[in-house]
């Protein structure tokens, strides 16, 4: 999609590209490695592209929602042959994720942030959605990694190990 519109945006010397990332674009999520990897990749792609196209008046932003009340848990695929050795931790994480999604914000909140990114006079590169994601973003940057790790494991109900 991006490649299809970039030529026109360059010609008109303006445009906005908004990608939907996730808090797991900058925070790990156990047992969700492939999803996390795709969101980490989107973060890198969006930031790199922003630097490449800014000279043409084009801005690239990434929206970073946290837990949002969608059907993502029901629509996610579980490995075809999950290893039993990971079953206990995987089940705890999936339960924690499902409960957090149920308590999460609505997709409307994310849509409002997308609208802000599209219409802002001074678009930002990143738009964390909600106070929890903003807090986690700051914590990830400034807290000691051991403290962040303990909090993450607690959030996902994993043993402190």
Where are each of the predicted segments found?
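Residue(s) in the substrate-gating loop at a strand-loop-helix junction
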Residues: 22
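SDR active-site lid
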Residues: 55-124
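Active-site-adjacent segment of SDR/Rossmann-fold oxidoreductases
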Residues: 8-9, 27, 48-58
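Active-site helix of classical SDR
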Residues: 2, 38
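Rossmann-fold scaffold of SDR-type NAD(P)-dependent oxidoreductases
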Residues: 19
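Short-chain dehydrogenase/reductase
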Residues: 126-139
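Active-site loop immediately N-terminal to the catalytic Tyr-X3-Lys motif
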Residues: 27-34
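A short helix-coil junction within the Rossmann-fold of NAD(P)-dependent oxidoreductases
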Residues: 4-13
């Amino acid at each position: 999609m991006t490649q299809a519109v970039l030529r026109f945006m360059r010609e008109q010397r303006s445009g906005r590209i908004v990608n939907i990332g996730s808090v797991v674009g900058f925070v790990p999520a156990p047992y969700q490695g492939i999803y996390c990897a795709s969101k980490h990749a989107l973060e890198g792609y969006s930031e790199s592209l922003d630097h490449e196209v800014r000279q043409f008046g084009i801005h690239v932003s990434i929206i970073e929602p946290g837990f949002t009340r969608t059907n993502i848990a029901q629509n996610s695929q579980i490995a075809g042959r999950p290893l039993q050795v990971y079953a206990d931790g995987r089940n705890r994480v999936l339960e924690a994720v499902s409960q957090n999604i149920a308590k999460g914000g609505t997709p409307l909140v994310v849509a409002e942030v997308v609208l802000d990114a599209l219409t802002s006079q001074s678009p930002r590169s990143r738009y964390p959605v909600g106070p929890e994601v903003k807090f986690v973003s700051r914590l990830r940057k400034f807290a000691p990694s051991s403290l962040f790790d303990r909090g993450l494991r607690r959030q996902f109900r994993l043993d402190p190990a």
